[in-house]
């Protein structure tokens, strides 16, 4: 019986560790999805600009839900972030191609994270099954004999 109790404690500890890892993966998955969605929105905006001619008016966000009216004077180029605080000017087509690569990277990271999360969930299920088995064994050992 003491051996079963010790095994249950070990299983509970392992379960808590795996649950914490699963929570972190779920949070990472959410951040990756948000990042991918942001890149997708930028890509769609740039694709829309390809069809525009001349100057046109836009709203420029300045923070706290406030905007200024502005005009796009160069709809053939975009300045895109390339990481580490750097941005470069690229043609719309090159910008879209760059964004597609980044979206693909995000999608690969999302797929890997989802796979890791599935594995953790399977491990959690196995630990729960083992714990239930031990608890049933203990319950049978405590049955009242007539």
UniProtKB/Swiss-Prot annotation:
Location of the protein in the cell: Cytoplasm
Keywords, in A-Z order: Chaperone, Cytoplasm
Residue stretches spanning the membrane: none
Pfam families linked to this entry: Prefoldin (PF02996)
UniProt GO molecular function: unfolded protein binding
Principal subcellular localisation of the protein: cytoplasm
Family classification: Belongs to the prefoldin subunit alpha family.
Physiological role: Molecular chaperone capable of stabilizing a range of proteins. Seems to fulfill an ATP-independent, HSP70-like function in archaeal de novo protein folding.
Known partners and oligomeric status: Heterohexamer of two alpha and four beta subunits.
NCBIfam families for the chain: prefoldin subunit alpha
Name this protein carries in UniProt: Prefoldin subunit alpha 1
Origin organism lineage: Archaea, Methanobacteriati, Methanobacteriota, Thermococci, Thermococcales
């Amino acid at each position: 019986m003491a051996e079963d109790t010790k095994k249950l404690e070990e299983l509970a500890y392992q379960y808590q560790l795996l649950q914490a890892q699963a929570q972190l993966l779920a949070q990472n998955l959410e951040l990756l999805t948000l990042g991918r969605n942001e890149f997708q929105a930028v890509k769609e905006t740039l694709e829309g600009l390809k069809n525009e001619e001349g100057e046109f008016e836009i709203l420029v966000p300045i923070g706290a839900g406030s905007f200024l009216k502005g005009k796009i004077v160069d709809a053939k180029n975009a300045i895109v972030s390339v990481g580490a605080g750097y941005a470069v000017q690229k043609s719309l087509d090159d910008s879209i191609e760059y964004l597609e690569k980044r979206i693909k990277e995000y999608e690969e990271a999302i797929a890997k994270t989802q796979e890791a999360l599935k594995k953790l969930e399977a491990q959690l299920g196995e630990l729960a099954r083992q714990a239930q088995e031990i608890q049933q064994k203990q319950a049978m050992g405590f049955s009242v004999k007539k």
